[in-house]
């Protein structure tokens, strides 16, 4: 699954259709298997007789029981025919053991993403999402990856390291990934992910590693109360030791951490939020921290810091403090940058809510998701397109819901923001755009666009194609040439909860060509209230308090 940043009304657009969908039953294992599998019916009644050095063994259904050493087949005249019956079953078994992609089925990838910003010999590596229940860290890393312009220096961002755990709102589906960097068995499901991020950390250009976390309460060197004490991790800059050998870039870890903490403490929202440096003195015997990503980086001779925002905060406030700390370290590393939002809790929240979108079928279907309805029904899509969906943020994903074939869930971090019920269609690629007259002017609208309409729009007829405006009930099969006005659409068919976005779909016979969206005068839209879309979920605390 890829992601891409899209302009607010830019290219990427898709929608659903009126009428009942073409229902396709989800395939079972039997229907997914090669066509020779039905021959099993003949094979079930066959009997093979085997003899070993110890005794003869009778087997049914190719299941051998009892001691078998050197089998000798009886009924030699029927041996080849019986093997011919069993061989397809063996092939079927091997086929089912192949990776999904090798069988030609949809493979929904949740590998982590590395976004490379800027170009310089020395790189700052920023990692978010190593624990899936810490949305402040992976949300901040997402904004760094998508809303910052690196003008001097280089920054590599991994915003979604433990993507499956992010989606499932879990600290770790297979245990705590941040405790797998000292040693890890190859049988661990996360072995490939851990090895890949270790390779990235060891990259000769990487000189500084920042690992973003959400920690409980407020770290204090001395006990103050149950929220503010040495067992807490929130609002701290973590170092594993005081420093690295002379000559290591930013190797004076304690000094660098103190400088950044002092800088961020100049712009606290409340005095309670003050940052402190927390030296875990890992090499002195902290067995848990010895397994962490940051200590792995230190052992590779790289300056590394853990940045902890408090879990007591909503996600936008956590991300605000994360970005404040990250910017402090970037400045100290000589990185110059610009961002396109204000570094305030409100500005961060607006940036996280903005520019949410997903594109399917090579951009012939685009859905803006900032105010999307909880369910989008009968969205025409070709089979296989959900696994290749393009999202606007790297912590967004399109995955099957409960029914693999009938429902798709769009995730934003650890929230599901909408559910799509697809209408699976064959695609027609012979048309790229349609001609329209919108508010008296003619335009050519490519599929995947959002078209702003003040009053009226007409789609020009195109020979061989028909138009279906979703929510506009004309009683005609082809709605090209008809005036389309906001008042003529049933609001419940809109893509957004505000009732301003409507799908216009184009078909050639039964094949789907593409769609674009009509956005009617937004100033007349009702405001949708009371729905949270930001990734935000307080995670369960570990016994260590983070």
Positions of PLM-derived features:
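Compositionally biased, low-complexity flexible segments
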Residues: 7, 11-13, 20-26, 63-67
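Structured catalytic-domain cores with a bias toward divalent-metal coordination
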Residues: 58, 62, 70-71, 75-78, ...
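Acidic, Ala/Val/Gly-enriched low-complexity intrinsically disordered segments
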Residues: 2, 27-33, 40-41, 54-57, ...
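N-terminal amphipathic/hydrophobic targeting modules at extreme N-termini
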Residues: 15-21, 25-32, 41-42, 47, ...
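Low-complexity, intrinsically disordered or signal/transmembrane-proximal segments
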Residues: 8, 49-55, 74-75
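Bacterial N-terminal signal peptides
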Residues: 84-99
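Short, basic, low-complexity termini and linkers enriched in Ser/Thr/Gly/Pro
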Residues: 33-35, 94
């Amino acid at each position: 699954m890829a992601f891409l940043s899209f302009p607010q009304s830019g290219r990427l657009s898709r929608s659903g259709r009126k009428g009942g969908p073409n229902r396709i039953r989800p395939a079972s294992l039997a229907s997914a298997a090669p066509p020779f599998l039905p021959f099993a019916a003949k094979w079930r009644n066959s009997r093979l007789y085997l003899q070993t050095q110890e005794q003869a063994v009778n087997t049914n259904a190719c299941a051998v029981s009892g001691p078998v050493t050197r089998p000798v087949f009886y009924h030699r005249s029927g041996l080849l025919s019986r093997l011919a019956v069993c061989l397809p079953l063996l092939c079927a078994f091997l086929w089912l053991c192949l990776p999904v992609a090798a069988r030609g089925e949809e493979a929904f990838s949740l590998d982590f993403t590395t976004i490379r910003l800027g170009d310089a010999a020395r790189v700052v590596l920023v990692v978010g999402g190593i624990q899936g229940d810490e949305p402040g860290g992976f949300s901040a890393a997402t904004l760094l990856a998508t809303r910052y312009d690196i003008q001097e220096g280089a920054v590599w961002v991994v915003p979604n390291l433990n993507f499956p755990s992010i989606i499932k709102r879990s600290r770790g589906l297979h245990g705590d990934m941040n405790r797998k960097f000292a040693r890890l068995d190859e049988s661990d499901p996360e072995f490939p992910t851990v090895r890949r991020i270790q390779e990235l950390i060891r990259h000769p250009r990487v000189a500084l590693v920042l690992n973003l976390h959400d920690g409980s309460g407020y770290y204090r060197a001395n006990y103050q109360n149950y929220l503010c004490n040495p067992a807490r991790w929130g609002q701290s800059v973590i170092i594993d030791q005081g420093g690295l050998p002379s000559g290591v870039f930013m190797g004076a870890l304690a000094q660098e951490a103190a400088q950044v903490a002092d800088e961020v403490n100049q712009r606290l929202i409340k005095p309670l939020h003050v940052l402190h440096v927390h030296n875990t003195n890992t090499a002195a015997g902290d067995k848990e921290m010895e397994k962490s990503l940051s200590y792995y980086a230190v052992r590779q001779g790289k300056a590394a810091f853990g940045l902890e925002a408090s879990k007591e905060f909503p996600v936008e406030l956590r991300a605000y403090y994360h970005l404040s700390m990250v910017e402090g370290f970037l400045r100290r590393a000589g990185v110059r940058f610009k961002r396109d939002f204000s570094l305030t809790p409100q500005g961060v929240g607006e940036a996280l809510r903005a520019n949410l979108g997903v594109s399917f079928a090579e951009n012939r279907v685009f859905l803006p998701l900032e105010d999307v309805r909880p369910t989008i029904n009968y969205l025409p899509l070709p089979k296989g397109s959900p696994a290749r969906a393009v999202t606007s943020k790297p912590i967004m994903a399109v995955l099957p819901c409960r029914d693999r074939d009938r429902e798709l869930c769009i995730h934003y971090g650890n929230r599901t923001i909408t559910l799509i019920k697809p209408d699976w269609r064959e695609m027609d690629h012979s048309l790229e755009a349609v001609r329209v007259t919108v508010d008296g002017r003619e335009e050519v609208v490519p599929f995947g666009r959002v078209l702003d309409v003040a009053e009226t729009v007409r789609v020009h007829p195109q020979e061989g194609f028909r138009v279906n405006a979703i929510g506009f009930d004309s009683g005609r099969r082809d709605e090209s040439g008809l005036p389309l006005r906001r008042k003529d659409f049933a609001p419940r068919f809109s893509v957004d909860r505000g009732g301003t976005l409507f799908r216009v779909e184009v078909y050639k016979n039964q094949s789907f060509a593409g769609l674009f969206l009509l956005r009617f005068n937004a100033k007349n839209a009702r405001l949708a209230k009371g729905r949270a879309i930001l990734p935000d979920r307080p995670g369960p605390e570990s016994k260590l308090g983070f």
